[in-house]
Curated annotation (Swiss-Prot):
<dbReference type="Pfam" id="PF00106">
    <property type="entry name" value="adh_short"/>
</dbReference>
<keyword id="KW-0677">Repeat</keyword>
<dbReference type="InterPro" id="IPR020845">
    <property type="entry name" value="AMP-binding_CS"/>
</dbReference>
<dbReference type="InterPro" id="IPR010080">
    <property type="entry name" value="Thioester_reductase-like_dom"/>
</dbReference>
<feature type="modified residue" description="O-(pantetheine 4'-phosphoryl)serine">
    <location>
        <position position="565"/>
    </location>
</feature>
<feature type="region of interest" description="Carboxylic acid reductase domain R1">
    <location>
        <begin position="643"/>
        <end position="937"/>
    </location>
</feature>
<feature type="region of interest" description="Aldehyde reductase domain R2">
    <location>
        <begin position="1026"/>
        <end position="1256"/>
    </location>
</feature>
<comment type="similarity">
    <text>Belongs to the NRP synthetase family.</text>
</comment>
<dbReference type="Pfam" id="PF00550">
    <property type="entry name" value="PP-binding"/>
</dbReference>
<feature type="domain" description="Carrier">
    <location>
        <begin position="528"/>
        <end position="605"/>
    </location>
</feature>
<keyword id="KW-0560">Oxidoreductase</keyword>
<protein>
    <recommendedName>
        <fullName>Glycine betaine reductase ATRR</fullName>
        <ecNumber>1.2.1.-</ecNumber>
        <ecNumber>1.1.1.-</ecNumber>
    </recommendedName>
</protein>
<dbReference type="InterPro" id="IPR000873">
    <property type="entry name" value="AMP-dep_synth/lig_dom"/>
</dbReference>
<dbReference type="GO" id="GO:0009058">
    <property type="term" value="P:biosynthetic process"/>
</dbReference>
<dbReference type="Pfam" id="PF07993">
    <property type="entry name" value="NAD_binding_4"/>
</dbReference>
<dbReference type="InterPro" id="IPR020806">
    <property type="entry name" value="PKS_PP-bd"/>
</dbReference>
<dbReference type="InterPro" id="IPR045851">
    <property type="entry name" value="AMP-bd_C_sf"/>
</dbReference>
C-alpha cells in the first residue's frame, strides 16, 4: 500500500505538503529558518527567475552552493520550474568543475557571489546572496510547465568519477526518488515535528522530509565529518533522525561512549555508504539503546535496494552485518558470470531492475550500455537492469549480505572512487607512463595506493613523481590537487619497472602488485620502529596485575595471571589514559595475551589516526577552536620580573639551552615539566636524571643548576598535564611566565599522531595561563608556513585554514599551525602571549654542540663520507645556531613594551648548500657534486647497509626517512625585518667556514667524521669555570683596574656590563671582549649620578640577565696637603669614592638579596687601612668604603651575599697623574723605585676571590708591591 501519492512528481508532493502544514517549520540551517509557506514563497520566486533563463523539462540547473537552506531552495526551485537540479560540489577543483559544466551544459547555475569566479565560460549565473537582476539578455520565453504526473522527466543529476578521465553524470527521473521515498517510509515514516539532519548524503535526504511535514536541518559542510561539531549540532537542534556512514559513526562512538545520553531525542539513525561490521553494530546498539538503527544499501543509479533494523538482523556468526531484506525483491537479482540467477546462499553479482533506476549517464551512451544491460528476468519491453558491481548473497533468513566488489570501484570512508579516473589523471598530469590505483588496508586504515611506471620524459606540466622512503609524494599530491578531489588522491606511491599482467587475460594482475612500503626508522633493520612497544604494555600490565614487570613474557595471558573483569577494566582505563585514545574492554578481552594487547592497541591507534586524517579539514577547524573559558586580563610579565617560570621541552635540544640561559639570566625559580606517561610525584628523581643526561650531552651541566630548578612530572597529551584539578590550579597561581618549547617533532607522522601533544598540550598551557594570569612565550616553527621561495615570509603572514591540508603536507607543521592559532586567539582574548617562530636550529656557535637528530647535519656528514654531495638547484642551508635562538627568545621575552606578537628567529637569507660544501672543502672535506637521484643511489649502495649506533648515527637518520628533492627545495624562509630591530643586541652568528669549522670539530669529536677540520683561526677555549655565564657590572671600566677586571671576567666566560664616562673607550673595549664570545653591554655612566648607575644596571639586567657580580672600580685619587684646602678635588673625591659606591650598592644589592646570591667587590685601597700623608681625604673616602662594606657584610650574613674589599697598593693607573697640588706631589707622590702593581695583578686577585666556592668568602684582599708594604 502506497504511503504517499506515487503518481505525482517531487514538486507536486512538496506543494501538497505546503497546503497541509503551511505554518509548520520546514527548513533551517545555521543562519535562518523557513515555515512551509515561507519556503514555498522562496521556491516560487527563484523558480520564476529560472524560467526566465529557459528552464523547462529536462533542463539542468547547476547548484554550486554549500550545504544550506539556499541549496534546498535551489533544488526545489529547479524542480518547480520544470527542470532538474545538477549537483556541483564546492570541493571540485577548477578543471573538474569545468569538465562537468561542459558535459552537462546547464541552462543556469545558482550559487553565491564568493563562488562565481569558479564558473568559466558563458554559463549564466544567479547569485542568491546578491539582489535579483534581470537575465542580462538571456531571457527566454518559458515553455509550458510539465504536468505533475510526468515521472519520467529528469529530477536531478549527480556526478561520480569516471574511468576514462571524464566524470559521469547520473541522471535520475522523478519516478526513482518518489518510489524510493515511499519504500523508506514503509520502513520508517516521518511526521510533523520530526527533525531530520541532512549531511553526508545531502541531495538524497533533503527532499524526503519535506513531503511528510517534517523539518529539514541542513548540516554545514564543516560539520558533516567533524564528530564533535556534528554531535553538538544533533544535540542542540534536537534532531530526531539522521543518516551517516559507518565510519563516521565509529569515529563518533570512539569519542562519545555516552552518545545516547547526549542525543536522547534521536529516534532513527540510517547507516549507508559502507558495510557495517558486527563490532560496530554491537557498539552502536549499546551506545544508542533508544535509537532505531537502520542499515541501508543503495546506489546512485538505483536508489534503495535493501534495508533492515540492525538490532533485529545483527549476528555474531559473521564479521559483517547483513543489510536487511530487499525492498523490491521482484527486481533484485544475484547472478553468476553467465548472467544466471544463483541459489540462495551463493555469492554473485547484484543486479537491480525495476522502476527506480536512473536513466543512465548523460552524454555517455557506451558507458550507460555497459552498466545498464537488458533485464532478462523482466517481461516489460526494453527493461534494463543495473550492474552494481557488488558481490552479494541472499541468506536463508531472507536478508541480503554484501560480500565484496566485482568491479573496480573503491569504497573509501563513504566516498566512491573509480580507480580509472584517478589513474587517467595521474598519467595525464604527472610523468607517469602507466598506473594502477588500488585500495590497501581495511576500515579506517583503508587508503589509496598508486603503483606507477615512470615516464622518462617530464615537463613542467607533467613533473616527475618524487617518492620518499615512507611512500609519500607531497609533490604529486600538490600537482593533482587541481584535478582530483582530496579523497581521490593516493596516500601512498610505489614505483615499479612494469605493472604485472595476468598470464591468460593479459590484464593488469592487481594481486601480484607488491605491498606498499613500510617506513624505515632508526633501528636500521628495515622495519618501522613503532613508538608503542611491548615494554609500554608490560609496564601497565604489571601495575594492573600487581606483578613484577620483568617476569612478563609476550605469550602470557592476562587472565591466566589473575586478571578478571574488574582488573581488565582498570587495564583499559590505564591504557586509554597513557595513549590518548579509547581502548575498549571487549577488544582487550578478545586477544588477551601480552603480545595480543600490543597488536590491539596499535590497531586501535592506527584506526584512530586514519579517522582523523580522513576528515582533516574538519578536524583542523575543530581543533583550532579555543575553549570559551580561556581568557584573561592579566598584564604581560617579563622574564626579568618573573618570580616563577614554567619551562616545557627541557629534555629536548633547544629546551636545554633555554634552561641554562634562564638560570644564568634570570632570578626566577624554574619549574621544568618533564614528560611521564603516568605522572607521579615519585617521578621527580627520574626527571632530574633525564635533564642532567641531556645537559651533560650538550656540555651545559653543572650541579648548581638544580638549586633553582623544580621538576614537575607531567604529560602534555593529558588534560591538565595529568595533574589533579587542585594541583593544576596551585601551579597556575605560582607561575608568572610560561616558556612553552615542548613539541612532538616528526616530519613523517600524520596530524593525528602528533595532535595530542602539540595541539592538546598547547591548549592546556593556555588553560593554565588563563587561570593564573601567566604570560605565555610560545615557541613555534617556520613549518606553520609553506615554502617561500627566495623572499621570506614577514612576521604578519598567516596561512588560511583552508590551505593547511594542501600547503602544509606534514603532520608536524599542521599541528604547530593549529597550536599557533590557539595562542593567537588567546591573545585576542586578553592573555599576554608572544609567538617565536624559529627556523632550523643548528649547533652551538661556540662549542658546536649539536642536535643528534638533525637531518641537515646527517646529509652533510654522509656527503663528506661519500666524497659526493647532492647538487640540488634551489637547496639552501637554513642553519640557526641554538645559542642564538635561545638568547633571542629570552631577550624578546623581556621586551614587554613592544606591541608585536609574532617574532621570527631564523636566517632571513640562507646560504646555498653549494657554498657550504665549498667552505667544507677549505676545511679539508672535499666533495664533488652529484645529482640527487644518483646521490641517493650511491648512498644506498655504499652507506645504507652500514651498522648504525653512535658512530653511524647519521646513517640511522637517513635510513629513518630519506628526504625528497622537493623537501630540500621547499625551504621556509622567515623575513625578520620587524623582529631584527627589537633583538638587535642579540647578534646572529654568520654561517661561514668559521662556524662550519666549529661544527665539524664537534662532529669529529662525536665520531661522526674521521678527521678534524683544518684550523681556520686560533681557537679560544670555551670557559667552563664557575664564572661562565655569570653577569657582572663593572664601573670605572674605561681604563686601569676596571678595564683589566672586565677583560679578566670575559676571559672567564662572564658577560659584562661596562660603565664609565668615556663611551668611546668602552666601545673599544667591547669590541675586544666580544671576540671571546661573551656578551658585552656598554653604558655611559657617571657613578655620582644615581639615575645613570640605575640605567647601567637596568641595561645589564635586560640585555644579559640578573646581576651576579658587582665590581665597583670607579674612583679618583688626588695628592693634596690638608693645609692647602683643595676643595674642588676634595669634593670630587667624596662624590666619586663615597657617593659612587653607595649608588652602585643601591642599584644591585636588593636584586642579589632577592635571588639569595651575589658577590659585591669594591676597590678600596691600602690607604683604607692606614692613613697616608698627602692622601688624607682619599684615605678618608676609602675608610668610608671599608666601613660601608663591613656593615653590608655583617647585616646580610646568611642571606647568600659575599662582600669583598680589595685594597691595592701602588698600581700603574691614570690616577697618579690626576693631582694638581705640586707641594703634595713633591713631598709624598714621588716614586720609591719599587716595582709597582699592574692593573692585571689586581684583576687576577679579584678573579681569584670570585672563583671561590659559594661557602667561601674572601672579605678583604690586601695586594701591594712586594717592596712597599704598609
Amino acid at each position: 500500500m502506497a504511503i504517499i501519492d506515487t503518481t505525482k512528481d517531487l514538486s507536486a508532493l512538496f506543494t501538497q505538503q505546503v497546503r497541509a502544514s503551511p505554518n509548520a517549520l520546514a527548513l533551517e540551517d545555521d543562519k535562518t529558518s523557513y515555515t512551509y509557506a515561507e519556503l514555498d514563497k522562496e521556491v516560487e520566486e527563484l523558480s520564476r527567475r529560472l524560467r526566465s533563463y529557459g528552464v523547462s523539462r529536462d533542463s539542468l540547473v547547476g547548484v554550486l552552493l554549500p550545504r544550506s537552506a539556499h541549496f534546498v531552495i535551489a533544488c526545489l526551485a529547479a524542480l518547480r520550474a520544470g527542470g532538474a537540479f545538477l549537483v556541483l560540489e564546492l570541493a571540485y577543483p577548477p578543471d573538474l568543475l569545468a569538465d562537468v559544466l561542459e558535459d552537462a551544459t546547464p541552462a543556469v547555475v545558482v550559487t553565491h557571489r564568493s563562488e562565481t569566479g569558479k564558473i568559466k565560460g558563458s554559463v549564466p549565473v544567479i547569485s542568491l546572496d546578491e539582489p535579483p537582476v534581470d537575465a542580462n539578455g538571456h531571457t527566454v520565453e518559458p515553455g509550458p510547465l510539465p504536468v505533475d504526473d510526468d515521472l519520467d522527466r529528469l529530477a536531478f543529476v549527480s556526478y561520480s568519477s569516471g574511468t576514462t578521465g571524464k566524470p559521469k553524470g547520473i541522471a535520475n527521473p522523478h519516478r526513482a526518488p518518489v518510489l524510493s521515498y515511499n519504500l523508506r517510509f514503509g520502513v520508517q515514516d516521518l511526521q510533523p515535528g520530526d527533525r531530520v539532519a541532512c549531511n553526508v548524503f545531502f541531495i538524497w535526504e533533503i527532499l524526503r522530509p519535506l513531503i511528510r511535514g517534517a523539518t529539514v536541518v541542513a548540516v554545514p559542510d564543516d560539520h558533516s565529518y567533524d564528530p564533535a561539531a556534528l554531535v553538538d549540532l544533533l544535540a542542540s537542534r534536537h534532531i530526531t533522525e539522521t543518516l551517516m556512514t559507518p565510519t563516521l559513526l565509529a569515529t563518533i562512538l570512539s569519542r562519545h561512549s555516552d552518545i545516547g545520553a547526549r542525543l536522547p531525542e534521536l529516534r532513527t539513525l540510517w547507516l549507508n555508504g559502507e558495510v557495517v561490521t558486527t563490532d560496530l553494530a554491537r557498539r552502536a546498539i549499546r551506545a544508542l539503546p533508544n535509537t532505531r538503527l537502520l542499515n541501508c544499501y543503495s546506489a546512485c543509479e538505483t536508489h534503495e535496494i535493501a534495508c533492515g533494523d540492525i538490532k533485529e538482523i545483527v549476528s555474531d556468526e559473521s564479521q559483517y552485518c547483513p543489510v536487511g531484506p530487499l525492498l523490491d525483491p521482484k527486481h533484485a537479482y544475484i547472478v553468476n558470470e553467465q548472467g544466471e540467477k544463483v541459489e540462495e546462499g551463493v555469492s554473485g553479482e547484484l543486479c537491480v531492475g525495476g522502476p527506480m533506476l536512473a536513466r543512465g549517464y548523460i552524454n555517455r551512451p557506451e558507458t550507460t550500455a555497459k552498466a545498464f544491460i537488458p533485464d532478462p528476468f523482466s517481461n516489460s519491453p526494453g527493461a534494463v537492469m543495473y550492474r552494481t558491481g557488488d558481490r552479494a548473497r541472499m541468506l536463508p533468513s531472507g536478508l541480503l549480505e554484501i560480500t565484496g566488489r566485482v568491479g573496480a570501484m573503491i569504497k573509501l570512508r563513504g566516498y566512491s572512487v573509480v580507480p580509472g579516473k584517478v589513474e587517467n589523471d595521474i598519467v595525464k598530469h604527472l610523468a607517469v607512463r602507466q598506473c594502477a590505483v588500488v585500495a590497501h588496508g581495511e576500515g579506517l586504515e583503508r587508503q589509496l595506493v598508486a603503483y606507477i611506471v615512470a615516464d622518462q620524459e617530464h615537463s613542467e606540466e607533467r613533473p616527475t613523481v618524487e617518492i620518499n622512503s615512507s611512500g609519500h609524494s607531497p609533490g604529486a599530491r600538490r600537482a593533482l590537487t587541481k584535478f582530483l578531489a582530496h579523497y581521490m588522491i593516493p596516500a601512498l606511491w610505489v614505483q615499479v619497472d612494469e605493472l604485472p599482467t595476468h598470464e591468460v587475460s593479459g590484464k593488469i594482475d592487481l594481486k601480484r602488485l607488491p605491498p606498499p612500503p613500510t617506513e624505515v626508522l632508526a633501528n636500521g633493520n628495515g622495519k618501522k620502529e613503532d613508538p608503542i612497544g611491548i615494554e609500554d604494555i608490560a609496564a601497565i600490565w604489571a601495575v594492573a596485575l600487581k606483578v613484577p614487570k620483568a617476569t612478563l613474557k609476550p605469550e602470557d595471558n592476562f587472565f591466566d595471571l589473575g586478571g578478571h573483569s574488574l582488573s581488565i577494566a582498570d587495564l583499559s582505563s590505564r591504557l586509554s589514559r597513557k595513549f590518548g585514545f579509547r581502548i575498549p574492554i571487549v577488544r582487550l578481552a578478545e586477544n588477551s595475551t601480552l603480545s595480543g594487547h600490543l597488536d590491539t592497541v596499535r590497531a586501535i591507534r592506527d584506526g584512530h589516526t586514519a579517522a582523523v586524517q580522513a576528515d582533516l579539514p574538519a578536524v583542523l577547524r575543530t581543533d583550532a577552536t579555543l575553549d570559551e573559558e580561556i581568557r584573561s586580563d592579566a598584564k604581560i610579565c617579563s622574564l626579568t620580573d618573573a618570580k616563577t617560570v614554567l619551562l616545557t621541552g627541557v629534555t629536548g635540544f633547544l629546551g636545554a639551552f633555554l634552561l641554562k640561559d634562564l638560570v644564568d639570566s634570570t632570578s626566577a625559580h624554574i619549574i621544568c615539566l618533564v614528560r611521564f606517561n603516568e605522572p607521579e610525584d615519585d617521578d621527580q628523581p627520574g626527571g632530574v636524571a633525564r635533564i642532567r643526561r641531556n645537559l651533560l650531552d650538550l656540555g651545559l651541566w653543572n650541579d648548581s643548576i638544580m638549586e633553582r630548578v623544580e621538576i614537575l612530572p607531567g604529560n602534555l597529551s593529558r588534560s591538565r598535564f595529568g595533574l589533579t584539578p587542585d594541583a593544576f590550579q596551585e601551579l597556575a597561581q605560582r607561575v608568572d611566565v610560561i616558556v612553552h618549547a615542548a613539541a612532538s617533532v616528526n616530519l613523517v607522522y600524520p596530524y593525528a599522531a602528533l595532535r595530542a601533544a602539540n595541539v592538546g598540550g598547547t591548549r592546556e598551557i593556555l588553560r593554565l595561563a588563563s587561570q593564573g594570569g601567566a604570560t605565555v612565550q610560545y615557541v613555534s616553527t617556520n613549518g606553520v608556513l609553506p615554502p617561500s621561495g627566495e623572499k621570506g615570509w614577514p612576521e604578519d603572514t598567516m596561512l588560511d585554514m583552508k590551505d593547511v591540508p594542501t600547503k602544509l603536507l606534514d603532520g608536524y607543521g599542521q599541528t604547530k599551525w593549529v597550536a599557533e592559532q590557539l595562542v593567537l586567539e588567546a591573545g585576542r582574548r586578553g592573555l599576554p602571549v608572544r609567538v617565536h617562530r624559529i627556523g632550523t636550529v643548528s649547533g652551538h656557535s661556540q662549542s658546536g654542540a649539536a642536535n643528534a637528530w638533525d637531518l641537515l647535519t646527517a646529509l652533510i656528514v654522509e656527503s663528506i663520507k661519500l666524497g659526493k654531495y647532492p647538487d640540488v638547484e634551489g637547496w639552501r642551508a637554513e642553519m640557526t645556531p641554538v645559542d642564538f635562538v635561545s638568547k633571542a627568545i629570552i631577550h624578546l621575552a623581556n621586551q614587554t613594551a613592544v606591541e608585536q606578537t609574532v617574532f621570527h628567529i631564523g636566517d632571513p637569507d640562507p646560504v646555498n648548500t653549494r657554498s657550504v660544501f665549498e667552505d667544507l672543502k677549505t676545511l679539508g672535506y672535499p666533495t664533488e657534486p652529484l645529482s640527487w637521484d644518483d646521490w641517493v643511489a650511491l648512498w644506498t649502495s655504499q652507506r645504507g647497509h652500514v651498522k648504525g649506533g653512535d658512530g653511524g648515527f647519521t646513517v640511522d637518520i637517513l635510513r629513518s626517512g630519506m628526504p625528497s628533492i622537493e623537501f630540500l627545495r621547499g625551504i621556509v624562509v622567515l623575513d625578520n625585518s620587524a623582529t631584527r630591530p627589537i633583538r638587535r643586541e642579540v647578534e646572529r652568528p654568520k654561517v661561514d667556514r668559521f662556524l662550519l669549522e666549529t661544527y665539524t670539530r664537534h662532529w669529529f669529536a662525536r665520531g661522526w667524521l674521521k678527521r678534524p677540520p683544518i684550523r681556520q683561526r686560533q681557537l679560544s677555549p670555551i670557559p667552563k669555570g664557575p664564572l661562565s655565564g655569570k653577569v657582572a657590572v663593572v664601573t670605572g671600566a674605561s681604563s686601569g683596574i676596571g678595564a683589566a677586571v672586565a677583560t679578566a671576567l670575559a676571559r672567564e666566560g662572564a658577560h659584562v656590563a661596562l660603565g664609565a664616562r668615556r663611551l668611546d673607550a668602552l666601545e673599544s673595549l667591547k669590541e675586544k671582549l666580544s671576540a671571546s664570545g661573551v656578551k658585552v653591554v656598554t653604558c655611559k655612566t657617571d657613578v655620582t649620578d644615581r639615575k645613570q648607575v640605575e640605567g647601567l644596571v637596568k641595561a645589564a639586567t635586560e640585555e644579559l640577565g640578573p646581576v651576579d657580580i658587582l665590581v665597583a672600580c670607579a674612583g679618583v685619587m688626588y695628592f693634596t696637603m690638608m693645609a692647602n684646602t683643595q676643595m674642588d678635588e676634595w669634593e670630587r673625591t667624596v662624590d666619586v669614592n663615597c657617593k659612587g659606591i653607595l649608588n652602585s650598592l643601591a642599584s644591585t644589592v636588593p636584586g642579589m638579596l632577592a635571588r639569595g646570591k651575589g658577590h659585591v667587590v669594591a676597590i678600596s685601597s691600602d690607604a683604607g687601612r692606614k692613613v697616608f700623608p698627602g692622601l688624607g681625604v682619599y684615605s678618608a673616602s676609602k675608610f668610608f668604603v671599608e666601613a660601608t662594606l663591613q656593615a653590608l657584610r655583617l647585616e646580610t650574613a646568611g642571606q647568600g651575599l659575599r662582600v669583598t674589599a680589595v685594597q691595592p697598593g701602588n698600581t700603574a693607573t691614570d690616577l697618579l697623574g690626576m693631582s694638581t697640588d705640586a707641594e703634595a706631589i713633591k713631598k709624598y707622590g714621588e716614586p720609591s723605585g719599587a716595582q709597582i702593581l699592574d692593573p692585571e695583578d689586581v684583576a687576577n686577585s679579584i678573579i681569584y676571590a670570585l672563583r671561590q666556592p659559594e661557602h667561601v668568602a674572601m672579605n678583604e684582599i690586601l695586594i701591594e708591591p712586594r717592596d712597599e708594604p704598609i
